[in-house]
Amino acid sequence: MKSFACNVKVNAIEYFHIKLNANEEIKVMKQKLRNLSAPANIIFAILAVFIFIALLQWSGKFLGLIPGMEKADDYLLQAIVETVVLVIFLGITYLFGLWDIFKENAAGWTRSLYTGGFFIVYCLYAVVSGIYLCFLGEHGDVKAFYNIIFFFIAVCLVGLVEELVFRGVVFNLLLRAFPKTKGGITGAVVLGGVLFGLMHFSNMGAGVKFSSCLIQVISAGLMGVLFCMIYASTRNFWMLAIFHTVVDMGGLLSSGIFEGGGVADRINEFSAMNCIAFVVLGIPMFVMLRKSRRIRLEMLYNNVTIIDDEREGAKLAVVSLVLGICSIIFSFFGYLMGLGIVGMLASKMSKRAKQYNNAIATAGMITSIIGFVLSVICTIGMMVLFASGIYDRLVNMTM
């Protein structure tokens, strides 16, 4: 009995010794991965993209070998694949010492949302358009409730996983590689966006034709540059994950609710008309890359304290008022309800920088609230018209 107890004690000591050594090895590996040279960081960033694509492709093929899975809903399969990728890249994030991305928020939520204001407008435009398309387009039968749930889960996972891979891992590795200057940070931003865009060529393996895929690649590249610039300015991972999810959800809403089309079918509908997205995304991209914004980034990454003065507060007040007025003017169909939200954010920031004698910011807040409320009312009104059939009757009367 005494011998047995001694053996148990020895085995326990050996187990904890092995575990301790394993922990030490992981610490050493993490330290090495944190201190990679600039070329090595770039190589690992590009390698992460290939790992991501390979995981998507091979996980999907593996699921196809499981009996019965070939009949499963496309979005269920995508949710499973994205979960696998998420788990693996969480491990990669930990090994490269990037775990803090989930806690960072350098600018605070108000400034973060204002900095990403374009995507507030774009996200709500995508959602409103998607809802209207569900009412107006020709669709198959409504999917089973559980398949609609799979759609929402899959889209949420896609947004989360792609932001984890391309902003959380790839872009942060590029930031480590490039110098913390205006040019260096801009280089990381542009390369991060380009890699995000090129990744979408992998959709050709899912049946997307080249012309449609090329439009998606260019649009995604421009969007990737915007996402990288916003992330560099705010260090707010969760905000971008939400933006990404909402944009995808708006664009794919009809395919998630109705039978008869998947993601590839939706992308194959892209035509020359979709090239307008290049302008819609290109203008805010160049605005975000302006010199003053890049100077602010250089200060941020060199630990220089940035404080908005009264002059900045006055500018924000004017922006708020302009956005508020525009939100009222364009409130009719509800597409641009995001203008009112961004106007409210600008007004709030203006009042922080200029607390007194700031009537313009107050006017901006009031007009922005009015514009947002009108947009919501108009959107609900349009949905009622579509659902009741009144809209169709009005169209038929004019024909």
Predicted regions and their residues:
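Functionally important transmembrane alpha-helices
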Residues: 54, 212-269
